[in-house]
Amino acid sequence: MKFEQPLQSATLLKRYKRFLADVVTANGEEFTLHCANTGAMTGCATPGDTVWYSTSSNVKRKYPHSWELTQTQSGDWICINTLRANTIIADAIEAGDIPELSDYDEIRREVKYGSENSRIDILLKSNHKVDCYIEVKSVTLLDAGMGYFPDAKTERGQKHLRELTAIAKSGLRAILFYAVPHTGITQVSVAKEIDPKYDLLLKQACDAGVEILCYRINISEYDLTIGKQLPFISKG
């Protein structure tokens, strides 16, 4: 996925109210960015980090600039715009770059499903195999090379696990896809200390047949592409 226009850089001053961040450019201009990330963003929003942002052509937007990437002071690159992951994964599936999700005839996005009024991120359909429901999550919480999800308690994430579990029990294919847009993460696990209920529901989902896939997202200020598969580490 190429960015529509080259990203521009600034230095992060602070993130606040979840959806806003103040930055300063090299020439001293200060302004506010929109932040499309509801998570805690632990380690992704340290004052002094380099922020890469896009600019919308929509003149009606109150905050025309959107925070896309963080370049940390330790050298890691992180895509903090969680809206990007679904597009990257869908594009990679269509291009045949994810072997586990190949040989489907049709890909749909944001399809209503389940008993809790949910929308599945990606639905794959085929004339010769069962439907495949894919829920995409972005992993950006880093600790000593391990990426953890979630980075904050997530009732929405819990709901998605219940929905995927029901899909798997019905005989259809259900996949929890951890996209890893963080160059410092080499493997993925669940953050059970942060959200014990999510950890329990994930175990139940796996027991029901829900599959887990983890793939790195390659990051630059020009584009985002699918990278190599990463291991998921279960911690009992």
Swiss-Prot record:
InterPro entries: SfsA, SfsA_C, SfsA_N
Disulfide linkage: none
Entry coiled-coil feature ranges: none
One MF term in the entry's GO annotations: DNA binding
Entries under Pfam families matching the protein: SfsA, SfsA_N
Transmembrane feature ranges: none
CDD domains (alphabetical): SfsA-like_bacterial
Family: Belongs to the SfsA family.
PANTHER family to which the protein is assigned, alphabetical: SUGAR FERMENTATION STIMULATION PROTEIN A
HAMAP family xref list: SfsA (MF_00095)
Protein name (database record): Sugar fermentation stimulation protein homolog
Organism: Proteus mirabilis (strain HI4320)
